[in-house]
Amino acid sequence: KTLLPSSKLISTDKLETQKPLEKSGIAVAKTKTVNNFEQIENAFEELGGGPLWIRAKSGAGGNLSLLCNNSSEAEYWIKLWILRKKANFNDFMIQQYLPKRNIAWDSFWYEGKLISSFTRERLEYPLKHISPSGITGTPTVSKIIVDEAVNSIGEKAVKSIDKKPHGNYAVDLKENDNGDWYVTEIDSGKFHTTTPLWGYVSTKFLKQDPTHNLPYLYTKLGLGEILDPEPLGSDIYPEGLHILRHIDCGTWIYREDGFKEQVI
């Protein structure tokens, strides 16, 4: 037994994801595609000038991404990957830069019903000094936040791509200078990388009911040991709880009141 959305909803193309979001009135980052180097300067002008993100249409971990201040930087960046035969011109897109908070909204659905969700802010990335973009995939420091606007946008975003959500849907959001939220990506049918880690913390250290551990709940449903999950609501983890981790440093939970404990 699986809990997966329809295969037609699982798209690796970020531009394709934007279409139903825009149709539903959900803000997305302004984006341009280019077919040749001559179009790059025009794209910068149309998007209001730099800095702008140059990034791949698909992939994770900041794939082929760089924050470029002007069209010349963007041209050199794209040309580098084409010369190395690691990408083609149509692999790239140019996207609005949203400078404020970087948010992940994880949600679990069962036959169209939202069972649970939680929101976390990504604060630091591992070894970001070796990546030109400063993005290296999964965060080393993140914290739980509670934001009703994010909950509302996350639910609306998922329902815009799937009328009867089933399984896990991971939504990425970025914030602009005015505090407005933009959906940048939806991963249908998968967990964000640290979701199992938050589930482990929930069960072992927060002593919550095991169903707050979303991978555990997913597994039990798949095995038929849970038949009809009870909704837990949004914000299933306590606000302000941090997870800190790094290579060879273990994993810790932390609060700003000074509490900390090693979990792995």
PLM feature segments, named:
Residues 69-71, 75-133, 137-158, 162, ...:
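Phosphate-binding site of ATP-dependent enzymes
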Residues 50-71:
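Conserved anion/nucleotide-ligand pocket segment
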